[in-house]
């Protein structure tokens, strides 16, 4: 299984925890980001130590054809000291139907949401590939179950 993480990999808590989890399952991971938003070196060292194969690039086209799961993150304005820094990387990756045309037919596109402009709304209509709404729905049920477990264990105390 090849998972590609795309976007702001430096500041995204979800990308850091996801790649750490995946490092226990023999998954190959591609990191695609602008150099200024690359996955932190300490995270890469940690997952490589677990035997994970990683590849870093700033070019999505290099890896989209071999990707099984595309995990897209937004580039957040609040992470930049100036508007100019943000403008330099804003919109550098947009997943749209043209990108999906170069991808595997069974590619799953995930996103932690909310999104800005990194996934074109036209992708929403690709029911098979646009898995982020299913991801959101399942995440709701997971959080409900975790809260129920925590509440039950606190009742026993």
What residue spans do the PLM features occupy?
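Rossmann-like adenosine-cofactor binding region
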Residues: 45-123
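Adenosine-phosphate binding glycine-rich loop
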Residues: 106-107, 112-157
